[in-house]
UniProtKB/Swiss-Prot annotation:
Keyword Secreted belongs to the record: no
GO CC entries: large ribosomal subunit
HAMAP family: Ribosomal_uL24_A (MF_01326_A)
Function: One of two assembly initiator proteins, it binds directly to the 5'-end of the 23S rRNA, where it nucleates assembly of the 50S subunit. Located at the polypeptide exit tunnel on the outside of the subunit.
The protein, known as: Large ribosomal subunit protein uL24
Pfam name, any one: KOW
Assembly mode: Part of the 50S ribosomal subunit.
GO molecular function: rRNA binding; structural constituent of ribosome
Origin species: Metallosphaera sedula (strain ATCC 51363 / DSM 5348 / JCM 9185 / NBRC 15509 / TH2)
Keywords of the record: Ribonucleoprotein, Ribosomal protein, RNA-binding, rRNA-binding
Residue stretches in coiled coil: none
Amino acid sequence: MVSSKLIAPLSDELAKEYGMKRIGIRKDDTVRVMRGDNYGFEGKVTQVFPESGRIAIEGLTRKKADGTPVYIKIHASKVEITKLNTNDPRRKDIINRKASRQKEEQGGKAQ
């Protein structure tokens, strides 16, 4: 189960392709930072921290006092998903279910 803290909006291209606006972030998704000092940085999600609602992005690090690099944790609401990892069949089912539900809602509003 994906924590409600870990839901992020899809990019405009993905939103049109999949017919939904947001989905839970998973490891190996590609995201773009949309707020803060690291605005515009794009990379692959390496770790997900459901308890704090934050993620670690490949290449987004800082150095500790002793010189070892550590990931900068970014809140999931401050990123935009640019590429989905669809290797998991359960996630494909979630995407299909959300997309069909979205189409039904749009069809009902048009009438």
